[in-house]
Each structure stands twice: as C-alpha cells, then as structure tokens.
C-alpha cells in the first residue's frame, strides 16, 4: 500500500475538506444565480408586452433562417441581433421598474432616464431589423420570383 501523500502535516485533510466545501458553495451560488436570471426572464415575459413581441419576432427570424438555409455567418448575426434586442429590452424594463420604485410621480429626470432606455431598445431593434433585412430580403425576393 502506498503511503499517504505528505502535504505539510496532518492539516491537509482539513484544507482539502474546506476546498471541497467552498467548491460546493460556489456551485450552489452559481445555481442560484441562474435561477435568479431565469426568474428575470420569466418576469419580463409575463409582464412586458414588448418583450413578448421581441420574442415572437425572434422566433420568426429563426424560422426564416431555417427555411432559407442561411449561412453560419448569417446565423451568427441573427443570433447576436436577437440576444442584443432582448437584452436591451430587459435592461430597459429593469431601469423602468427601478425608476418607478425611486419615484412614482412623473419627474423630469426620471422621464429622461426612461426615454433614454427606451431609445436604446429602439436603436437595437432598428439596427437588428436592418441587418435582418439585408440577410433575408434577397432570399425572399428570389423565392417570390420562383412562384
């Protein structure tokens, strides 16, 4: 039988145990972080109409990508656009909810903050629409010519 490894005294078992426990705790923290994140997505989906619209348009873009057999690079652009718009919508929702907690009344500074956040979503949506149009319009035109 091989001798036990020497790690500087008998305290190595305690150190190893502490290391294992810390990894287990960090794993639970990671699990909880994912649970909180999925809960945030659920909150947006159940309470925000614009979020539902963006998800629906994302599904349409994915279906069009499948139907037209878009390239890997085109998929990367579409996936980035979907993630970008949905993420911006979630950030906008978080900012709006935070502003509502800070001040329920219509305050000029709060209005500006909400308008800027909404503008960020609009910029993301418009730029994503343009990129999607560049990818899909030529394919749609070719398809329509074959009818």
Positions of the model-derived regions?
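Hydrophobic alpha-helical transmembrane segments
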Residues: 13-86, 91, 106, 114, ...
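Glycine-biased, low-complexity coil/linker segments
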Residues: 8-9
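Transmembrane alpha-helical segments of integral membrane proteins
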Residues: 92-108
